[in-house]
């Protein structure tokens, strides 16, 4: 049978996620994968635009943040987001091609909730989103 087009997952369905990545191919692939779980996706092409979109778009419940981007990288963007009171507990998952332990530690040190290295395993990413969104629901 054809793989489920719309995967029903009550933790993910209808949730709004912000993708911040400068590579349109990554944005397209992530958007396609997350929309299959009935998630709502908005995106920005660098950290500065991501922060602007986060401020201007109500209801964003998680951020997927690339690290290496022009204008404002993911480290700077996560630091700025964590400096805003209303986003201190917003789940931010860092997405990076750098896979060394120090890279993970650097991401967590500036405010990432979690970290996943590229190339992304979509099942692992969905699992992380499920965990962080569930935790967010439980803390309300």
PLM-predicted stretches and their roles:
Residues 69-72:
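Receiver (REC) domain active-site loop signature in two-component systems and cognate sites
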Residues 58-65:
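Active-site beta3 strand of CheY-like receiver
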Residues 120-129, 137:
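C-terminal output helix
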Residues 66, 96:
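Active-site residues of response regulator receiver
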Residues 28-36:
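Charged docking surfaces used in two-component/phosphorelay signaling
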Residues 22, 43-52, 74:
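Helix N-cap/capping motif at the beta->alpha junctions
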Residues 1-16, 51, 55, 131-140:
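Disordered, acidic interdomain junction associated with two-component signaling
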């Amino acid at each position: 049978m054809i793989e489920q087009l719309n995967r029903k997952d009550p933790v993910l369905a209808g949730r709004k996620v912000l993708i911040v990545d400068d590579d349109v191919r990554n944005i397209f692939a992530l958007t396609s994968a997350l929309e299959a779980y009935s998630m709502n996706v908005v995106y920005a092409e660098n950290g500065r635009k991501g922060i602007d979109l986060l401020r201007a778009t109500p209801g964003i419940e998680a951020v997927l943040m690339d690290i290496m981007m022009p204008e404002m990288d993911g480290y700077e963007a996560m630091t700025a987001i964590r400096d805003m009171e209303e986003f201190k507990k917003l789940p931010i998952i860092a997405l990076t091609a750098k896979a060394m332990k120090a890279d993970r530690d650097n991401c967590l040190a500036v405010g990432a909730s979690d970290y996943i290295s590229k190339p992304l395993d979509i099942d692992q990413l969905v699992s992380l989103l499920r965990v962080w969104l569930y935790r967010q629901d439980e803390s309300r």
